[in-house]
């Protein structure tokens, strides 16, 4: 196997796919490498990010939730991006690559529906057909996003096999692509999967961290003590981390979904509580049974409900450059409510996991002077019905 770029991060990553898909992956890598060196492609991408998506996004200082502590907390506002989440960044890049390769169709998978919405809007903008695979359970719990996708002309295909969630949608999307790659581009939604996707997605998300670095230096005159992001597959987190990896004074903290609690087994934290295996075209930590079957992941947030994690996160964890922790459903929900009530911002449940860890750091050491940045990866409009039902069942509303 000869590739232009290194397909591994330490021992993690690779291209564990059927032989039939190798030409498609090689073509994609070649297109990406040439596009990265092409000023015209870069100018087109930058123009879409600025004038269509609305970059740069704001870096907002929290006014109220840090009261009584010595923490300064900023939110990187990816929730303000067109489409409602960080997902829009990299799909614009991938859609331009698809056009560059002469493809006419986009295949995508989605969990929370945010990547589906982003894929649909990019396809509509650039005149590409779009079909999106989504677990049947996620279709139910994310109905507003399903309608958004269909409004923009995408075909949404519910997947009923397995657990009817994101991992099953990924499997169906790959199956489709293996028979249609000559005309279709598979628009993978996270920094995981077979090479070159983890690298492509990181590079098409790295403006998150680049902007954050410039903005925090402008506002505070120094780098943050830590940047914090939620981790499912890990695209928003690697986008935030990438530009800080060589700044060793900056802590990188990834927050996995602890679900009902790690001890219950109902979580989505393979990085700290899984075992290394082969899944979704890559070698990475994953949740698996004693005999190596992929175990069901669980999270209150559909976008974190994924049984594996991107290979660069696995590598950063293995060398100790990044720390990975977990936050339960209940902790994320409390953070969601806190931001709504005290800052007037409705965060996605995914992003609420990262916020919850920042609040925990703040509460545990109120006397510690610390400068933290949370990547607020998406807005919570899609989650209000889920939160409403939980709060109603608890008698809180």
Swiss-Prot record:
Residues modified to N6-(pyridoxal phosphate)lysine: 87
Q: What is this protein called?
A: Tryptophan synthase beta chain
Gene Ontology terms: biological process: L-tryptophan biosynthetic process
Cellular component per GO, a single term? cytoplasm
Q: Which UniProt keywords apply?
A: Amino-acid biosynthesis, Aromatic amino acid biosynthesis, Lyase, Pyridoxal phosphate, Tryptophan biosynthesis
EC number(s) on file: 4.2.1.20
Q: Where are the transmembrane segments?
A: none
Return one GO MF term.
tryptophan synthase activity
Q: What organism is the protein native to?
A: Salmonella typhimurium (strain LT2 / SGSC1412 / ATCC 700720)
What pathway, per the record? Amino-acid biosynthesis; L-tryptophan biosynthesis; L-tryptophan from chorismate: step 5/5
Outline what the protein does: The beta subunit is responsible for the synthesis of L-tryptophan from indole and L-serine.
Q: Write down the required cofactor(s).
A: pyridoxal 5'-phosphate
Note whether Lyase occurs among the keywords. yes
